[in-house]
Amino acid sequence: AGAVIPGWAAIEELGGVDTVQVDADELFTADSVNLEDIRIFKGGRIDRAILYAASILNQSCETLRGLFRQISEDRTDILSPVKDLETPYGLGFAAWGDNNRVLIGNRAYMEKEGVPVPETEYEEEHSQHGTLQILYLAVSGNLHAMFVLRSTGGRNAARGLEVLQKENIRLLVTCKDPSLTARHITDAYHLPEGMVTLLEQDQCDALNAAPAQPE
């Protein structure tokens, strides 16, 4: 069995390694996520949806913070104060803002919290059958918006991943962005199917508990 090496450090000297572990923040920078579409649901308002999302993501998600800061023209002064931030891994974020409980996350998170979501066919259509990322926003238990996103790979990470691909080394990814899947990472960097695994919470815990590799 090969070792799990965290990060890009000494990537050219990976003798005997079969797996590298990185965080999604190392694959996608704050300016690599694009907003493709916003769908607003009954009772929602586009300006409020963007403000809620920007306020929470500014404190909780590196890869999405840049996008929503850009949409709000970097006006951090207009962001709502956020209280009691929760970050259930792989699902999304919850917080109190403007006296409302706000949830931002994927379909699984909305369903877990009892928020009604559109039919899967609607999501499939707007995500172009899973090619694009979907991020839902709910306020006080009601679905307000669906953000449709696309992440673009970066040049530096692409070079590192090319080395891994040549050596048949798999990539384990920890990720706070609930809209990202292994497929999105694979597509963004044109990697072979099966090379990328998005880690679950218990796998992250096991990695953190594992003894560090000797220098």
Model-identified regions with their sequence ranges:
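Conserved catalytic phosphorylation-site environment of P-type ATPases
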Residues: 1-54
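ATP-binding catalytic core of ATPases
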Residues: 39-90, 111-115, 119-124
